[in-house]
Amino acid sequence: MVKTHNLGFPRIGAQRELKFGLERYWNGDATRDELTALGAALRRRHWSDQRDLDLAPLGDFAFYDHVLDMSFTLGNLPKRVQDFHGDALDNYFRVARGRSAHSAHEHASCCGGVAAGEMTKWFDTNYHYIVPEFHADTNFSLDPSRLLQQLAEANAQRVNAKPVILGPVTYLWLGKAKDDSDRLALLPKLLPVYGALLDTLTAQGVEWVQIDEPILVTELDADWRRALRTAYEALETRRIKLLLATYFGQLQDNLELAVSLPVDGLHIDAVNARDEVDALARALPPTRVLSVGAIDGRNIWRTDLNAALDWLEPLARQLGERLWLAPSCSLLHVPVDLASEQKLDAEIRSWLAFALQKLAELKLLATALNQGRDTVADALAENAAAIESRRRSPRVHNPAVKSAVARIDARLGNRASAYPQRAAAQSARLKLPLFPTTTIGSFPQTAEIRDARRRFKAGELDEAGYRHAMHAEIERSVREQESLQLDVLVHGEAERNDMVEYFGEQLDGYAFSQFGWVQSYGSRCVKPPILFGDISRPSAMTVEWIAYAQSLTSKPMKGMLTGPVTILNWSFVRDDQPRSVSCYQLALAIRDEVLDLERAGVRVIQIDEAALREGLPLRRAQWPAYLKWAIDAFRIAANGVRDDTQIHTHMCYSEFNDIIASIAEMDADVITIETSRSDMELLDAFDGFRYPNEIGPGVYDIHSPNIPTQEHIVGLMRKAAERIPAQRLWVNPDCGLKTRRWAEVLPALTNMVAAAKTLRSELRNGL
């Protein structure tokens, strides 16, 4: 009999209950007991949702981040929080956010307290994890309380649970040695703690543990391969069964290694590695389980179940009970339940599957394999009809858009002049000081803004009333910026619910959910739009708002756009054509908007490419092809303007030392980047590469509520000036300020502007 299991379930709740519970707790409006009770209630519900599985995951729930959870399980707390009094939950949030709940007096390290842990992308997804921190003298100690508590809950609910833990080698690989020591040198100290954890779970009657080593789908050198072998040979002696889980890609040159590791089962991402399944089935020892990730855990399209059965049936005959079925990866990356989407177009809705629907697909596949297709014939017929509807729909295919993409040539991506000529023209037009100050785009989304948007969508506020409310918020943002004496202003994006969804709502070829939320980090959730068809722009999307904002000030007002690569990477993207084609379609639409902004008199236009790096394939051998079309798409979008129009781009969470040449090829006049959490480490890229244009290294971490001091910002910019000529440096935050409160934003920006003035004075005086 084929078994079913799941690698992980969305933790935020179908209605974002975890998000709101966390924020109530952080704001002092909920107690610790109320927060922990909410977590327990969500786990109970999620296990109930997975009751038809043979094995449900346990330990996939986290209050902030599962990698941070693993750090606490292993006793690996950053040194800066070890001396704080209070319990583990206090320290947990200190590492995640820079402060515990209810502790407004705690500030970042720049201000005498604790800095939030560095945050970066989880492989090539839009989820972010807190980076484990290591030193040569790091020690580990087991704290199994989180897993044991959840195991007790699962047992009380009579759930057949499979604990999920991050594997030791991936854990080290994901982390950062703060003293540049060798992370792998810690493996001998780490493995006994993993062994003790497995022994603890064995003593509790656990049969299977899922141990995730997704680095097996990346390019590994000999040391990391040797570490994997060492780790699993050391853990082999434990009396518990290990399911080694890989996901997000193909094993390729690691396939032989994965097969040879002494574990009891191996999970493979069969969505991306379908052509490796047969080889694995032949190569695995005759007692080993092969778990096949046959359902896409990262996208929301329905599975073609009949096509899946065509290749699963021979596999089931070959492997019998050694075949397990699962999603390709954790369902953390998809929304919870399509049944909530009552306002979504019925035809498009019929093409989709969220987490609960994917589990139903899993059950249907297992039933067909175990009992025959005839037992689920009606469900298979309905699935086939939906697949065919999508394939043939004229809503998906637009001949005019396809023709426009076919006409793209290299000239479309080129500026009229090289950067030095453009810089001179822009300097004459903009007349900015040294160390010009700006922000990245958004200002706080206040309760008043959210209420106006809610009432407008509910029909309680007419369009004129909504525009009046948004104009008032835009004017407030402009006046605050003028008072702060910022040099290049933004309109604050009051009218935007999300930097991708806002544009998708105005593009043909997109659809939108009401409850399609997924976790980005902590309490931050995003609702990716659904790119289902060919993309076109029926009319201008931002010009009216930016033109109004510019009318309020004589200072330059930035037009704010999201770039084609980021819109693509932060959407649920159609899987029936290459991603590059969809990206070129988006680029043409954004290009039209850029030119409309320029015609409206906008002198500075920012095209955010926050997600450029996250689209990189996990294997470097595949990077050149991706970077070619991604950079081409940005250039198509940006480069139709005059020399004296200044193009900015922004990247957040982007470690791009290894793609700096490609970043330069974008040829943006100004690039702003996230650097503060890494203490300007990202600027190491400029030690060996002379970046030709202007750059704004982020000088404070907007993801933390802590207020940076003027002195701290000056210090960071001095570091930046060691690598970038001061004449080409901008001063700006790391990211947009949407998630912060005005009470946090105003003092932070006050200090930032004061720091810029200090830097100008130092430069004039030759300091």
Swiss-Prot record:
Residues that coordinate or bind Zn(2+): 650, 652, 674, 735
CDD domains, per database record: CIMS_C_terminal_like, CIMS_N_terminal_like
UniProt-annotated binding residues for L-methionine: 440-442, 493, 608
One example GO MF annotation: zinc ion binding
SUPFAM superfamilies: UROD/MetE-like
InterPro entries: Cbl-indep_Met_Synth_N (IPR013215), Cobalamin-indep_Met_synthase (IPR006276), Met_Synth_C/arc (IPR002629), UROD/MetE-like_sf (IPR038071)
Residue sites binding 5-methyltetrahydropteroyltri-L-glutamate per the record: 16-19, 121, 524-525, 570, 614
Annotated catalysed reactions: 5-methyltetrahydropteroyltri-L-glutamate + L-homocysteine = tetrahydropteroyltri-L-glutamate + L-methionine
Assigned keywords, A-Z: Amino-acid biosynthesis, Metal-binding, Methionine biosynthesis, Methyltransferase, Repeat, Transferase, Zinc
Name of the protein in its database record: 5-methyltetrahydropteroyltriglutamate--homocysteine methyltransferase
